[in-house]
Structures are given as C-alpha cells and as structure tokens.
Amino acid sequence: MNQKIKILHTIIFIFSISFPFSANAMTVEEIIKGRKAMFSENYQNAKKISILLKSKKIEEAKPLMKKISDNYKKLLDYFPENTKEGFKTEARPSIWENKDEFNALMQKASDDMIKFAKAIDTAEDLRAVQKELMWSNCTACHSRFRAPH
C-alpha cells in the first residue's frame, strides 16, 4: 500500500511540474513581488546592456536582451484582477482599465528587444537604436501605467 502511495505522489509531482507556470497558483503577494522583481531585473539588465554597448561588447549584450524579452512575455500573466493593490505595487489602475493596450505594450517591448538584438550588428548609432527599441518602451509604459515614485 505504501508503495502505491509513493508512486501516486511521484506521478502527481511529475504531472504538476510538467505544466507551464501559472500566476493563478500564486498568492497576490507572490504575483506582485514577482512582477516587481522581473521589472527590476529588466532595468538592471538594460543598464548592463548600455555599458556593454558602450564598450562594444555586442555579443555579451544579446543574452540580456533575450532575457528582457522573455520577462516581458512572462509579465503578461502577472496582472490578474486581484493584484491591483498591496505589497507596494506601483501599478496604476489604468493597467486593468486598458488591459489590451497594456498587453500590447508588453508584447511590443518583448518584440522590440529581439529586433534590438538583431539591429545592433549593423547599426551605426547604437544609442539611437537602444533609445528607439528599448528605452522608449520603458518610458511609454511608465508614463501610462506606473505610479510616480
């Protein structure tokens, strides 16, 4: 009997980890802190990208661009209705009032990071490309969807 229970637990465990991440399984605190951590990681990586590009270390910057792109895609799942308040969120209500616009901006930011990674190989003005494909998305989102801090 104990052997059957162990097998059942193993099957349940394997089954549960084989599904993609779902914010629905997380608490409000975990979701809010998780999205804040991803945005913070994106900002830290964006600053690193600036330094790397200034030093002409283009290939070292590309994995950071991919990571930022991936985070933006993940963030689409980190704004359920029950996470509008609490845990020092800086998210404005406009996110939920204009969910399609917000999601489109997150998707655009993700797509633009991939474009950025490709464009830096041939761009003459790296700062201009960085401003257009990275920083402009940060500015657009912060001005519309993030509380002043």
Sequence positions of predicted segments:
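Positively charged n-region of N-terminal signal peptides that target proteins for export
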Residues: 1-6
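Sequence-pattern detector for short linear motifs
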Residues: 7-9, 38
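Bacterial N-terminal signal peptides
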Residues: 9-19
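Sec/Tat signal peptide C-region and signal peptidase I cleavage site
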Residues: 19-27
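Sequence context surrounding c-type heme c attachment/ligation sites in exported
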Residues: 28-149
